[in-house]
């Protein structure tokens, strides 16, 4: 029999992230209406709340998953303190990444957290080398550090193969040594 394990502890954090990729079947997989109905429970924690982090194609525009969520949240007076986003680049274009972040900030008028980012080709996971990942990490970090509305960012993933995709994006290898990406951070 499974035991109850609370996901929120008194850890000293003042922030709580919303649902992870609710627009994706293999992630939290929920409708906007389901997320809106659960949101008051997150608000009741008293923590600063990050929006649900949608996949990139469902982040921008009024008709996107996040656009509909934010419209309904605002109409109901629900609190969303910052917008959490994911960004996976297939072309190493940091200028496009910056434009995406600026568009998110312009549309939602809130601070932005990039809670997952890396180079990724889901059809060919090993397409990008560790050196390419490291360079994207370096240039992307510099770019985000220059954007005053980006409060946090978290690279994907912590250790190579830990994501199940083998994107050459891990910060640590299987022995716990820093990879080229890890040395950037």
Protein language model annotation of sequence segments:
Residues 14, 20, 66-122, 151, ...:
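Aromatic- and acid-rich polysaccharide-binding/catalytic face
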Residues 39-43, 70, 105, 141, ...:
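Non-transmembrane alpha-helical segments in soluble domains
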Residues 1-81, 88, 125-131:
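Substrate-binding cleft of extracellular glycoside hydrolase catalytic domains
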Residues 7-8, 99, 143-185:
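Aromatic-rich peripheral "rim/lid" segments of glycoside hydrolase catalytic domains that contact
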Residues 42-47, 76-79, 107-108, 142-150:
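A structural motif corresponding to the C-terminal end of an alpha-helix
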Residues 31, 35, 97, 133, ...:
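Aromatic/hydrophobic pocket-lining residues that form the small-molecule binding cavity
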Residues 24, 50-56, 107-137, 155-172:
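Active-site clefts of carbohydrate-active enzymes
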Residues 59-61, 93, 163:
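Short acidic, gly/pro-rich beta-turn/loop elements at beta-sheet edges
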């Amino acid at each position: 029999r499974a035991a109850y394990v609370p996901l929120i502890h008194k850890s000293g954090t003042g922030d709580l992230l919303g649902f992870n990729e609710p627009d994706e079947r293999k992630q939290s997989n929920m409708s906007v209406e389901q997320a809106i109905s659960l949101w008051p429970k997150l608000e009741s924690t008293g923590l600063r709340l990050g929006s649900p982090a949608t996949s990139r194609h469902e982040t921008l525009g009024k008709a996107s998953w996040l656009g509909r969520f934010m419209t309904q949240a605002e109409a109901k007076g629900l609190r969303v303190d910052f917008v959490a986003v994911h960004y996976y680049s297939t072309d190493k274009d940091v200028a496009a990444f910056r434009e995406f972040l600026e568009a998110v900030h312009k549309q939602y008028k809130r601070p932005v957290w990039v809670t997952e980012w890396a180079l990724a080709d889901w059809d060919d996971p090993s397409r990008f080398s560790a050196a390419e990942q490291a360079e994207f990490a370096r240039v992307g970090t510099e770019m985000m550090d220059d954007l005053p509305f980006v409060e946090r960012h978290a690279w994907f993933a912590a250790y190579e193969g830990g994501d199940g995709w083998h994107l050459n994006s891990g910060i640590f290898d299987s022995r716990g040594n820093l990879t080229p990406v890890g040395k950037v951070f």
